[in-house]
Amino acid sequence: MIARARWRRASTGRWRYLAGAAFAAALIAAGGQSGAGHSVGHFPSYYPDEIRIDVADPEAAGKGLGDATMHVYVGGVPKFGGPVPVQVKSLKSLGSFLVLTFDPASPRFQSAEARCTAAHFILRRVAQGGKDAGFAFHPYPVTPYHADYLHHIDKANAATLERMKPLGWHAVPPVALDAQALGAKGKLAETIVKSRLGSIAERPDVVLEEVPIDGLVSAASVQLGSWTGPPWIKEGWFHAWRLLAPGLDAEHRPAAEEAYDRLIHGQLRGGLAERVDLERKLVAALGRGCNRVVLGYAEREEYFNESYPPGVENVVNDAIAGFNAPVFIRTVKLKEYPWNGKLHLGVPAASDSAWNPVGGFTDATARLMWTAVADPAMIPFPFNASWMPNRVQAELSKVEGRSGGIKVPADALRPRAGSGELERVGDWAAASEKVTYEVLPSPFEDGTEQGVADLLYPYAFTYRWGDEANRGANAYDPGVAAVLAPIKERLAGVKVVRVNETKHAVAEGLELIVKTPVVEVYLNGAPGDERQVANLAPPWSTVPWHLLVLMEEAVVRGWAAFSAEEAARRKVPWLDLVRDRTLIAKLQELVVQFERESYRPAPLKDLVTAEEARARWRSLRAFAEKNGHFLVANGPYRLKSWTSDTIVLDAVREMTYPLGFGTFDRFVFPPRAEIEQAVQEGRSVKLRASAAMTLKGGRGYTETKEPLLHTTARGVYPLLVVSRYLLIDAAGKVVGVDKMRWAEDGHFAIDLAPQLPPGDYTVIAGIFLDGNAVRPSARVLRVHIGAAGSPG
């Protein structure tokens, strides 16, 4: 059987584009000339006219936030001269994990029993100590900031209770508390060790380490063409894998690897219950052996000035990335000058990574800049683990059960390994998923129009640079290959179905022509929800094909390498399209040569004519001559200027930009469900909940809480209400995952199946509003089903 899931957001795509265009046409502005002599104001989905990013230490940040010369401090903790000023507010997100790591060579801790006993002593001592700012004792790797926390909440609660228990009389002495045994890495880890456990050892047997979430996630992400995978990058089980798998020994690694491999390859036939059960098994397997043990997590608290008129509003943070996320740049606006003001951001450190959109932008400051300059196909949902449409809309068809699969059209294309040349898949190709995309293009900053070749070339790049056979030709980068592997493993074919063309009159005598490519992508074994599947390999690139080709040629010629690791191995510079003046000079000469030759790479021979290629290189040459760099994209902002401590970005006021004003505004102040009551009535569990909301009124905000009913609304927006419950048997196996029944009187009901075997069960229930799965209000209930079929 083939199931279809179609999802569109009213706030994206043609509807929002037309709303933005119509609004722009209605508000004729004095500035901003647009064709035929008409003056048309454009109001896109992002606000400030300029963004300035300055490096600032905590003292400077505190002063700047206080006097509104800085609007937002991203990624750091400011220091104020006294109490936090009343006009300065903050939002919290997941900052880091606190993890114990045992030295595998230590004779004290060769056995799992010794490690687990020592870890228990340390965790209990930490739990009984005082509170440290931002630290939460939580000895489980999936936290309340993870969208899948509901799937693990009983396990997390049990782990906390277990770690608080005193050890029995037979326990091994707490050798790990010896002053010569325990080390610390990171400021918070040092504080905890000193205050709870004594001095810090110089040559320790076990180390308490603070592991920032940014580093854990960025090392697994990919920038190519603004693919932002893997799609499961915000899941708690994936973070647990990244955090704990490196410490697994030979005895405990196979079970964890098997569970992880099944999760990321979609090898599941039992539906959501089987998947959730496997996620829980993976986390359990990662904790066995106590080679690495989670103590808890630290929150990241980021500050902004909200005073009127100089402050900002409409601030959204991501539960995992904080303010360093695409949604922040696309929502934040100045209170006094929403569209023509200058936004001042502070960051704690200068960028020290190379600026290239393949293996670069790895430090926090560079990532912040790239979230503004680039425009991904989809962006992370700020308060769950799924994705929001940005430059694509999608419809998913997926095989369910034991169907023979989805036939891939014979004329669909698939890159050849090694060369990346696009070949027909032939008559016998099949897939388990088909995603049909409508792509919302816009011109690149060098003036070239985004076309089909730009959408397809990232696939060719993936198969060329992901093939180790190309190592000898300098056309292989292990780091790049690793993050592109999920795409390469699953792609079954790509077919461009058509390019729709529509005309929109935005003013008298002014007409916009909108081209919308429709592309089918065929996949095999893609896991996750519909949007996660759609975000695996969308036909999209925020950089043009000719820039990707230029970077490839620079690497093949030995001028640079995409990633820091490969640059160090080959002893060449890390490819930087902006700040490496020597490389830029070489690239300028190469562009002139390619323009003269009308150069096209082999995968594009049938998609790009010689004249089109010549025009592309000509435009890129002119862009570099004018701007002094090669960072060409088609996102909301362009790079205007830079120094070692300052980056300035200009807004792109392009009338064909497809996303109109207010596209992401709904994610400001997400509502939250609060379960007020949960009771068992026979074979049903009934719950009642309230909706806690923050509503804007004039220049201020009002906190409100009201019963969650079918008529409850968030201002003018109806609430999207999603419920979920887990049913877990006495052995700990997840035997059911489903939504609750929402009755007309507002109560939620879980109806336990009549065929449910007698015994003890755990029910976990949660309710989410507008997709907000962070820090859920959940209930864990113990239910007994009697032998006669009625609850005992």
Locate predicted features:
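Gly/Pro-rich hinge or "lid" segments in bacterial periplasmic/extracellular proteins
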Residues: 31-45, 329-330, 351-352, 359-371, ...
